């Protein structure tokens, strides 16, 4: 998986990002769970899949278990895929420094984009920025209000 992705031209990456964004939005509207929707969109765009990573992301959505005061699961899902493309592998735990720092740089850039676009990386703060207030997604009435406010 890793080898086929590491030498993709920058212009192709831009096309992949656009396609993944469109797919992620569609998946979020249909399935909900932003962390897994981002992963699914990126997996489908890059024609890769890792069941363990996808399953491990189950509890991330809604700012970690729907609580909302943690990092956006879509951001976490994105960073997880960076590690799949440029991994620090277990068998090279003391090595893979170039990949590790490349992934760090990509994660830093993604966080910067979130801060520029949403003013925060926290789920509740992003909801407030986009919809005027945070929502307690554990509460069915709040979940309905979240949907009515334009979330998906």
Residue spans for each PLM region:
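Conserved mixed alpha/beta catalytic, RNA-binding, or beta-rich assembly cores of soluble enzyme
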Residues: 59, 63-64, 79-81, 85
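Short cysteine clusters
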Residues: 34, 72, 123
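Acidic-glycine-rich active-site phosphate/pyrophosphate-binding loop
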Residues: 5-14, 42-59, 136-137
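A short glycine/serine-rich beta->alpha loop
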Residues: 22-29, 61-70, 97, 147-152
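Conserved phosphate/anionic-ligand binding catalytic regions in large, soluble enzymes, centered on
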Residues: 66-80
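Active-site-proximal helix-loop elements at catalytic-domain edges
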Residues: 19-47
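Polybasic, low-complexity association/targeting segments
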Residues: 1-30
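Amphipathic alpha-helical interface segments
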Residues: 40-44, 79-82, 95-152
């Amino acid at each position: 998986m890793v080898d086929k992705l590491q030498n993709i031209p920058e212009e192709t990456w831009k096309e992949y990002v656009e396609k993944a964004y469109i797919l992620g939005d569609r998946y979020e509207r249909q399935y909900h769970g932003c962390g897994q929707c981002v992963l699914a969109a990126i997996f489908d765009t890059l024609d890769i899949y890792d069941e363990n990573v996808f399953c491990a992301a189950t509890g991330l959505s809604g700012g970690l278990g729907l609580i909302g005061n943690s990092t956006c699961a879509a951001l976490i899902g994105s960073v997880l895929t960076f590690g799949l493309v440029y991994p620090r592998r277990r068998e090279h735990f003391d090595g893979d420094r170039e990949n590790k720092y490349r992934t760090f740089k990509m994660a830093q850039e993604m966080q910067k984009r979130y801060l520029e676009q949403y003013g925060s990386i926290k789920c509740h703060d992003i909801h407030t920025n986009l919809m005027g207030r945070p929502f307690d997604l554990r509460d069915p009435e709040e979940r309905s209000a979240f949907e009515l406010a334009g979330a998906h």
